[in-house]
Amino acid sequence: MALNRIVLFYGFTPIPDPDAVRLWQRALCEKLGLTGRIIISKDGINATVGGEIGAVKQYVKTTREYKGFHGIDVKWSDGGAEDFPRLSVKVRDEIVSFGAPGELTVDAGGVVGGGTHLKPEELHELVEARKQSGDEVVFFDGRNAFEAQIGRFKDAVVPDVATTHDFIKELDSGKYDALKDKPVATYCTGGIRCEVLSSLMVNRGFKEVYQLDGGIVRYGETFKDQGLWEGSLYVFDKRMHLEFSDEAKTIGECVRCKAPTSKFENCSNPSCRTLTLYCADCAASPETLRCPGGCAA
């Protein structure tokens, strides 16, 4: 039986010809039998691909041969090509869609003017040091708000955003101005959203901004469920969520009966299909697999 794996990585680096990189990446993945999603822009690459482990290793090795991708931090997880419906390789204005391509500055070293990178151990050191001085680090979730329903850092601020496009409006709303003089640690799944988010926050006057290097994925690999993270990690493929150990808490609640769950399901109304948390019992019936307050659609 073949051993399969999924890799997640990104790299911010100037790309003179994004379309040429797109063609190369598509040809490489097709040759190796990989599926997944790859986004390329003038500012870099954002990729999640899966397949047979030998093919994935060859893909990573070949991708790193591109000048700007030598130092990409690759995160490995269980899964394979079957977790993605197809291979998608696209060129876009941004490799993560905040709707602010003009605000981001990228050079050979990555994003210019973003937050200070902290490895998981360094994050703990910062939290402890501030605690000793009577201060506290504010955790700021850089994901879509619904993702935090099943997992987040303890006492984290979770902005009211449906997509990353909503972050600029949210930051400009004034809701978080009281945090501008506090140490703020941004976090997201693999680190890419915080590369941009931390830069946007610095641009808006947040004085001490950090970003979790490698994101929740790297933190979970380091501390499992013995650190400051609680719950499951939402992922954008057929797996839907993953846990870092058997000791993971289930913090999500079914919208119908409040039973603990980490499983998102689409509303059974064909014109709605909103992704919502349901327990197995409520998800088993079309009558209960519906938005309890009525569908917005």
From Swiss-Prot:
Alphabetic keyword roster: Oxidoreductase, tRNA processing
Catalyzed reactions: uridine(34) in tRNA + AH2 + O2 = 5-hydroxyuridine(34) in tRNA + A + H2O
Aminoacyl-tRNA synthetase found in the keyword field: no
Pfam families: Rhodanese (PF00581), Rhodanese_C (PF12368), UPF0176_N (PF17773)
GO MF annotation list: oxidoreductase activity, acting on paired donors, with incorporation or reduction of molecular oxygen
CDD domains the UniProt entry points to: RHOD_YceA
Keyword tRNA processing among record annotations: yes
EC code(s) of this entry: 1.14.-.-
GO biological process, one term: tRNA modification
EC top class, as a word: oxidoreductase
Annotated SUPFAM superfamilies: Rhodanese/Cell cycle control phosphatase
Residues of the active site: C188 (cysteine persulfide intermediate)
Function in brief: Catalyzes oxygen-dependent 5-hydroxyuridine (ho5U) modification at position 34 in tRNAs.
Name under which the protein is recorded: tRNA uridine(34) hydroxylase
Gene this chain is encoded by: trhO
